[in-house]
Amino acid sequence: MVQLGIRTGRGGFSEWMKSFFGQREKNWNIELIKRNREKMARIFLVAIEQYNIEVSQKEVVDKNGVHIAEQLISPEGFKLVAGYHTDSISEEREVESNYGIYIQNLTTTVYSNLVIGYNWQTGVIVIVKVDAELNSYSDIYVFSKQNVFKAKHGWFSDVFQIYDRSESLIKNLLIFLSFKNRTTFMVDAEMDGSLRDEKGGSILIYMRQTQERADFVNFFRKFAK
């Protein structure tokens, strides 16, 4: 697996801070949330169907030359939450001023929206990379206890991390210490559409999912054991 592509309105500590300082409740577009939930379900079903087609056509051979049949996924029993991944891209630019030329360091945060399916019964996590409007999807990532070396959730940072499993113990340890061989993502209780791109479009999926997020956190803690 690979890393998918700043936190805002997340649960946990930030929710406690809001209640402590008595922040006013937001006005939410309930119809849009309902519509986005329906679109999440539809796009998840389509992604699973496409994944199963690709898996059935793929031939996998282990190190001993034995052919392995990839397991197909049934969409039944999956619960869904909206999430996202961030990548920080740094670049240097030369800037002219009255005092000469100097180097300016610029950091751009790139967001990747995710529909995250999880199944309590099978212990499987399916991550589908989508656009903010939930009109299309691209990459699909499937995780089970068998193909994960380690999973963890940072309470303070609120980042969910899944590390790839290797057949070598040494490689597993190196993967755990590496930033490259892991999948990281976040699941916020609230994503209110306040983050906008330069064209005015929504950056994150508009969603309020307090109870759903709490259920996913409980699932992930069990998944990580």
Model-derived segments and spans:
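Phosphoinositide-binding peripheral membrane targeting modules
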Residues: 83-84, 88-186, 192-225
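Anionic N-terminal interaction surfaces
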Residues: 2-140
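N-terminal functional modules and adjacent low-complexity/disordered segments of proteins
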Residues: 1, 8, 12-16, 73, ...
